Amino acid sequence: MTQWLQSGRRRDICALLYDAGALHGQELKSTLEATYDTRIEPAAFYGSLDALVGRGLVTKRTDGIHDVYRLTDAGVGGVESHYAWLSERLDAD
């Protein structure tokens, strides 16, 4: 399993992007905060996003004044691989 999946926040960001396709950074942060039912420090959140972009798992583009994030093919593969791994654990008899 790749290193980014060892971080719960990064994994959850990727899962949200997998579901949504593409999201503005603030929209993604708000969705994650609602999921966790807690506030996430902006520096920590955007640090996680920057790490995902740096690893080639997420792309970042500018749309007006907003940054928009989307999974790359490698990011999609990572989410699907993790889902398969998790499903095997849950389906084990």
What is the meaning of each model-derived region?
Residues V53-R61:
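A short, conserved structural fragment
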Residues L23-E33:
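Short acidic, hydrophobic short linear motifs in intrinsically disordered regions
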Residues E80-D93:
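Amphipathic alpha-helical dimerization/coiled-coil segments
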Residues M1-Y18:
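Short alpha-helical segments that sit at the start of domains
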Residues T62-V68:
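Short, Lys/Arg-rich nucleic-acid/phosphate-binding segment
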Residues Y46-D50:
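Short, hydrophobic-biased segments on the C-terminal half of alpha helices
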Residues L17-A20, T35-Y36:
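Short helix-capping/hinge SLiMs at alpha-helix to coil transitions
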